[in-house]
């Protein structure tokens, strides 16, 4: 994982793997849920309603599922998944990967507007009122320099065991219960210590993540997508 969200999901899987020794556990990994609360696409809806410019990276590609599809995947995992099975959608890189800037264009076209691409956030803000009145929408698309972004979405690693034949549209990761019990306990102790002290910062949490996940590839830039425009 390259960001805190991905790392937290990986840590959750490790704890569930430990629980799988005493009860049946199945899981799901899936792409971004389109227009879910707090997402960049949810921000498109909010900005459109307020007649504000759209801002999005043009070099990040993502897979997207509808809320219904993501719910169905979780339900199928619960009903059909075996112990320690992790279900994920079979998606084609050529057919399903799309950039946020492409989604912004499709979103605006759907609402009857053309994209007017600006060279800066200030330009987009300054031209918003005049452009929108002519059915054009100011957008600022940029190359990524924000924390925790990855070029493409990945559902599994080269070290994981896959079953790609059981279902037509769903793949399955069939991992063994691989976890370090001592490190999991140390992680919990670290979290408990922070809570007891009633004071912590992001760096404290990141340090605990690195101790449990040596492969964690987080790079802090101090910039975040939700701060854009």
Give the residues covered by each predicted segment.
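Catalytic tyrosine of NAD(P)H-dependent dehydrogenase/reductases that use a Tyr as the general acid/base
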Residues: 5
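Active-site His/Glu-centered metal-binding helix of metallohydrolases
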Residues: 11
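Strand-loop microenvironment adjacent to phosphate/nucleotide-handling motifs in alpha/beta enzyme folds
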Residues: 14-229
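Conserved catalytic loop/helix region of short-chain dehydrogenase/reductase
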Residues: 1-2
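Active-site helix of classical SDR
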Residues: 8
């Amino acid at each position: 994982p390259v960001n805190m969200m991905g790392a937290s999901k990986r840590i959750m899987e490790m704890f569930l793997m430990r629980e799988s020794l005493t009860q049946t556990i199945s899981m799901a990994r899936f792409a971004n849920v389109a227009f879910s609360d707090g997402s960049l696409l949810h921000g498109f809806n909010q900005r459109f309603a307020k007649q504000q410019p759209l801002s999005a990276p043009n070099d990040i590609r993502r897979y997207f599922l509808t809320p219904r599809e993501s719910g169905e995947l979780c339900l199928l995992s619960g009903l059909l998944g075996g112990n320690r099975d992790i279900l994920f959608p079979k998606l084609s890189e050529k057919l399903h990967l799309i950039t946020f800037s492409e989604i912004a264009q499709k979103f605006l076209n759907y609402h009857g507007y053309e994209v007017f691409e600006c060279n800066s956030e200030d330009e987009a803000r300054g031209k918003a009122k005049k452009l929108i009145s002519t059915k054009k929408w100011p957008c600022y698309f940029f190359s990524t320099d924000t924390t925790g972004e990855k070029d493409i979405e990945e559902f599994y690693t080269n070290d994981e065991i896959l079953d790609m034949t059981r279902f037509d549209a769903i793949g399955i990761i069939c991992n063994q219960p691989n976890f370090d019990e001592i490190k999991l306990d140390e992680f919990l102790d670290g979290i408990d210590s922070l809570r007891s002290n009633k004071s912590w910062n992001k760096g404290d949490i990141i340090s605990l993540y690195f101790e449990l996940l040596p492969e964690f590839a987080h790079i802090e830039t101090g910039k975040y997508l939700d701060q854009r425009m």
